[in-house]
């Protein structure tokens, strides 16, 4: 039941504080490394018997269940407000876009018809009941141009365009909210946008051979992301220009500490997976700081959303490690406490 904002802020902070104490992150996630099977992991996480499914399928079920729990907790918190924080609504669009990418990239769309879209309630941008007609699903949304399955040669740019739409809307929403709320959330949003842009730059350079002069408009100096980042844009330009074979060339860069260290006798290159894990850990630590510093404000839900997202990523990574028979190889970024903030 929605209540006045001041009352809702207090109630939501108290509720989410309790949920934060039970997040499967850091050392608490490490305690799950001792489980023997995916079925054991399911029981520990959800306190109920595991479905009778093969390993790979059970990994997928765990991932979807964890995501569903994330959305459930966040949507319930936002629903306490008569007018839910607009920035939170903009953040939730991420899951609409992710699901759209997943479905439209499937070789067999029919196989996905039985899957449930993210349960965003009134926060969803799309009309998922119209699936598999993509044109009907996205009609009237900010990405109504996404009206068919992209061709294989279009997929990368279409994914980038979807991401750009998401982050542009996120930034526009941030700029439209009251100054006090904006100040509490601005660094969280800017850091996420910057890390996203760097990830795309590295991916385009390493896997597709794209150079800065050929950069897609979404990652150019005239794009919306440039306007979002302001003076932070220089760290994106650095990622376009810096050597992909010399670790020392990145010295002094804003996100240098997220890059993998060189190994003797091995030609260095950025480890994109490790970079994204470290960036995810950094955002979690920053969100945790904001959560405890900005009591009784809408920043509480935004920070909680980012912390839950990191929890989900760690659980999914652990499930994949257990399936591969190597739970103890869970990347260190998901364990312990990192002094990133």
UniProtKB/Swiss-Prot annotation:
This is Uncharacterized protein TP_0534. One of its GO terms (molecular function) is proton-transporting ATPase activity, rotational mechanism. InterPro entries: ATPase_csu/dsu_sf (IPR036079), ATPase_V0-cplx_csu/dsu (IPR002843). Pfam families: vATP-synt_AC39.
């Amino acid at each position: 039941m929605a209540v006045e904002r001041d009352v809702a802020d207090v109630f939501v902070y108290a509720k989410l504080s309790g949920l934060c104490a039970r997040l499967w992150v850091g050392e608490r996630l490490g305690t799950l490394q001792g489980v023997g099977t995916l079925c054991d992991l399911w029981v520990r996480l959800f306190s109920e018997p595991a479905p009778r499914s093969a390993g790979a399928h059970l990994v997928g079920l765990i991932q979807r269940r964890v995501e569903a729990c994330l959305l459930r907790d966040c949507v319930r918190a936002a629903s306490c407000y008569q007018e839910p924080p607009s920035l939170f609504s903009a953040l939730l669009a991420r899951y609409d876009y992710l699901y759209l990418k997943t479905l439209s990239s499937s070789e067999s769309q029919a196989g996905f018809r039985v899957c449930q879209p993210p349960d965003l309630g009134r926060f969803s941008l799309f009309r998922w009941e119209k699936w598999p007609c993509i044109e009907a699903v996205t009609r009237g949304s900010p990405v109504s141009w996404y009206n068919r399955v992209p061709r294989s040669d279009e997929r990368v740019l279409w994914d980038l365009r979807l991401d750009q739409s998401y982050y542009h809307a996120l930034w526009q929403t941030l700029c439209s909210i009251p100054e006090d709320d904006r100040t509490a959330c601005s660094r969280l949003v800017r850091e996420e946008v910057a890390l996203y842009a760097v990830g795309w730059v590295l991916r385009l350079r390493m896997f597709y051979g794209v150079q800065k002069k050929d950069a897609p408009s979404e990652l150019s100096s005239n794009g919306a992301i440039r306007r979002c980042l302001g003076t932070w844009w220089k760290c994106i330009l650095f990622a376009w220009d810096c050597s992909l074979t010399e670790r020392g060339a990145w010295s002094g860069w804003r996100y240098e500490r997220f890059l993998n260290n060189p190994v003797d006798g091995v030609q260095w290159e950025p480890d994109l997976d490790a970079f994204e894990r470290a960036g995810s850990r950094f955002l979690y630590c920053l969100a945790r700081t904001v959560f405890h510093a900005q009591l009784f404000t809408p920043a509480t839900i935004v920070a909680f959303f980012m912390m839950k997202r990191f929890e989900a990523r760690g659980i999914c990574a652990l499930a994949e490690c257990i399936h591969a028979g190597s739970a103890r190889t869970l990347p260190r970024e998901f364990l312990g406490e990192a002094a990133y903030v």
